[in-house]
């Protein structure tokens, strides 16, 4: 979790507010993300040769802990895109997994999602155009709905990923850097002391 947080922090610092940016070298560093699993979400508009190069790059660096994500949203091109992904998986040895790119808990929140997108773009919803999702399928779908969209093997891969994830939020503890807390203080007593000093200076 700490390594992942460090990578996210770096991604935020190298981009403008509200954006993230990572270079390939950031992902390739040996000391980062070695305990993390990765979903490679290919861009449908890219040519197959580019997708293959990207997939091979990810496979080389995350072998045994990376999957090719198949996101299907009932937008008319699902079967063609799934076929392309299956070809790519077959030629690169990349395991293919069902993925949802979930943005809302229920389809009924689509209007709110559109408002949030327009707010991010600083425009009216009517002006957001193709920046809005084409439909409300990026929500938490039932297992029955997923079974009607994805081949069983892709859903099986989601269980394999889940079985490898042992992290729990209960494991998180804030760790104060040793150099911040003077020897005679505990982290809590030092924070209290500094807070009172700030109160005295301000008020």
State each model region's role:
Residues 1-72, 107-203:
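Conserved active-site carboxylates
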Residues 72-74, 102-103:
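Short beta-alpha junction loops
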Residues 74-83:
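Active-site glycine- and acidic-residue-rich loops that bind
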Residues 90:
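Surface-exposed, charge/polar-rich loops and edge strands
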Residues 94-108:
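Short acidic/histidine-rich active-site segments
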């Amino acid at each position: 979790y700490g390594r992942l947080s460090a990578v996210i922090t770096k991604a935020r610092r190298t981009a403008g507010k509200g954006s993230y940016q990572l270079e390939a070298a950031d992902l390739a560093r040996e000391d980062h993300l070695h305990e993390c699993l990765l979903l490679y979400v290919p861009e449908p508009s890219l040519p197959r040769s580019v997708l293959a190069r990207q997939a091979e790059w990810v496979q080389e660096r995350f072998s045994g802990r990376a999957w090719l994500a198949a996101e299907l949203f009932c937008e008319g091109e699902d079967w063609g895109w799934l076929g392309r992904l299956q070809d790519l998986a077959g030629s690169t040895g990349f395991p293919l997994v069902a993925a949802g790119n979930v943005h809302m808990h229920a389809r009924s929140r689509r209007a709110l999602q559109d408002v949030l997108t327009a707010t991010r773009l600083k425009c009216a919803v009517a002006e957001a155009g193709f920046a809005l999702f084409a439909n409300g399928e990026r929500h938490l779908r039932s297992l029955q709905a997923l079974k009607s969209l994805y081949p069983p093997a892709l859903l099986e891969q989601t269980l394999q990923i889940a079985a490898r994830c042992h992290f729990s939020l209960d494991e998180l503890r804030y760790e104060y850097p040793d150099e911040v807390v003077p020897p005679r203080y505990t982290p809590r007593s030092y924070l209290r002391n500094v807070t009172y000093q700030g109160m005295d200076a301000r008020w």
